[in-house]
Amino acid sequence: MSTLDDIFGSSPPPTTHHAHPNPPTTTEPSDLPSLRRQHVTAGYRDGISASKTSHVQAGFDAGFPIGAQLGMRAGTILGILEGVLRGYDESQKAVVKKLPAGRKGATSTNGTATPTSTMTDEERQAKRAEILALYQQAVKELDVRKVFEGISEKEISGGEKAEVRLGRQGEGAIGKWEEKVRVPRWEENMDALEMKDTVTAEGTGVEVEES
């Protein structure tokens, strides 16, 4: 035994077997799962955002013309009923101004008695109440949720385009009220009045130029 062996100790005897290397670890760094979740979430949101943008625009392009047309027709129906109500209110004000207070009746030029103002007022009020009830019913039934209620997702996803199915549903609701209010007749009267106003305005303009 040498002096160095006395100081540092003897070396261990050589071994005949080979040491096996440690198996590779599969443990991820602690921040990788968090980063993966963040990237997945960000990608999911970006995908939804891009999909919504394209589908919403496509749905708007397909559905807006139909909805706008139905909305204008519903507005025409409600506008007619509102105009009739205002007409009854204005006629009532005119009657009150023309007839003195407390006067129950009047005599026409041919000597026959005309209906009393009280009876005329009662009839007018009854008719106005009838039209008001019709208007309130129209407001309720022409609400967009009421017009399109009853359509299930199964019906829409059955192969037919959603805007076609919704348009047919809206056509039924709007068409019923157009027939009830007689919209075509009102439109004809409005066209005649507008034409009359145009002719009157043109005639007035000619007279002004000649004078």
From Swiss-Prot:
Q: How does it assemble?
A: May form a complex with LTO1.
What processes does the entry annotate via GO biological process terms?
protein maturation
Gene coding for it: yae1
Q: Where in the cell is it found?
A: Cytoplasm; Nucleus
Record bears the keyword Nucleus: yes
- The residues the entry assigns to the signal sequence are none
Q: What is this protein called?
A: Protein yae1
What this protein is reported to do is described as: The complex LTO1:YAE1 may function as a target specific adapter that probably recruits apo-RPLI1 to the cytosolic iron-sulfur protein assembly (CIA) complex machinery. May be required for biogenesis of the large ribosomal subunit and initiation of translation.
- Write down the InterPro entries for this protein, in alphabetical order: Essential_protein_Yae1_N, Yae1-like
Q: Where is this region: Disordered?
A: 1-35, 100-121
Residue ranges annotated as compositionally biased, kind Pro residues, are 11-26
What are the boundaries of the region deca-GX3 motif? 43-83
Please give the family membership noted in the entry. Answer: Belongs to the YAE1 family.
Q: Which organism is it from?
A: Aspergillus niger (strain ATCC MYA-4892 / CBS 513.88 / FGSC A1513)
